[in-house]
Amino acid sequence: MGIRNYRPYTPGTRQKSVSDFSEITHDQPEKSLTSFRHRAKGRNNRGVITSRRRGGGHKRLYREIDFRRNKLSVPGTVLTVEYDPNRNARISLVQYEDGEKRYILHPRNLAVGAVIAAGPDAAIEVGNALPLSKIPLGTGVHNVEITPGRGGQMVRAAGAMAQVVAKEGDMVTLKLPSGEVRLFRKECYATIGQIGNVDVNNISIGKAGRNRWKGRRPKVRGSVMNPVDHPHGGGEGRAPIGRSGPVTPWGKPTLGYKTRKKKKLSNALIVRRRRKSSKRGRGGRQS
């Protein structure tokens, strides 16, 4: 993947950059693997906003992705590499020997025409899915299962890759992209390789309208709201927040306040927590 930059013809193109889509080989999805789904727009079943700043955006067709990779010992051929509007990774259409077609997340350096497989006896090659117990130490993997048979739930974003670092008994240790070191059961499946579209984080949005196309609405600072809308709101002019520290719209401490439950069951599986990320950026005290 490459990144295409624009000349400053307009204020919107001055900082704008986009993917050059050079890896895309087909522009129409497989019709049998697409479906229309109404978007939640950040609302729950009662219509109450549960996730702010979502709504609008271009219409999308959902592509059914095979996260389980449960087509065992049946080779498949990669037919296309396609764009998916529902995620930042690319997807590949795979046709298996029995004629069935499925979409998978497109790994980096997986070419059209390559043959992939899933199962405990599959080769250690990009695109193949195996149990963690069969994957050598140091191998990069993605689409990792948390519960055996449930399908991959971790390491699915563009450019993401986890690394197998240790095996002991019934557990395998992976180092995740966040820096967290975690234990997984050896029966959990993972796919060899790194997710493609690795330069996606280097793309500059350039203008507010592109975020609206994606269904992302503006993020308003609490300090410019009224007191009825946010604890930071109100005052004359640019007033301080009037508290000892920043809080959420519901009055809970934020920006560094730990929210993870102390008795969370997965704590026993985490060897080392992920590295800290700084949330105090420009205007970070205003939530």
UniProtKB/Swiss-Prot annotation:
Keywords: Ribonucleoprotein, Ribosomal protein, RNA-binding, rRNA-binding. Gene3D superfamilies: 2.30.30.30, Nucleic acid-binding proteins, Ribosomal protein L2, domain 3. One of its GO terms (cellular component) is large ribosomal subunit. Residues 1-30, 211-287 are annotated as: Disordered. GO terms for biological process: translation. InterPro entries: NA-bd_OB-fold (IPR012340), Rib_uL2_dom2 (IPR014722), Ribosomal_uL2 (IPR002171), Ribosomal_uL2_bac/org-type (IPR005880), Ribosomal_uL2_C (IPR022669), Ribosomal_uL2_CS (IPR022671), Ribosomal_uL2_dom3 (IPR014726), Ribosomal_uL2_RNA-bd_dom (IPR022666). SMART domains: Ribosomal_L2 (SM01383), Ribosomal_L2_C (SM01382). Residues 12-22 have a biased composition (Polar residues). GO terms for molecular function: rRNA binding; structural constituent of ribosome; transferase activity. Part of the 50S ribosomal subunit. Forms a bridge to the 30S subunit in the 70S ribosome. PANTHER family: LARGE RIBOSOMAL SUBUNIT PROTEIN UL2M, RIBOSOMAL PROTEIN L2. NCBIfam families: rplB_bact. Belongs to the universal ribosomal protein uL2 family. This is Large ribosomal subunit protein uL2. It comes from Cyanothece sp. (strain PCC 7425 / ATCC 29141). The lineage of its organism: Bacteria, Bacillati, Cyanobacteriota, Cyanophyceae, Gomontiellales. The gene is rplB.
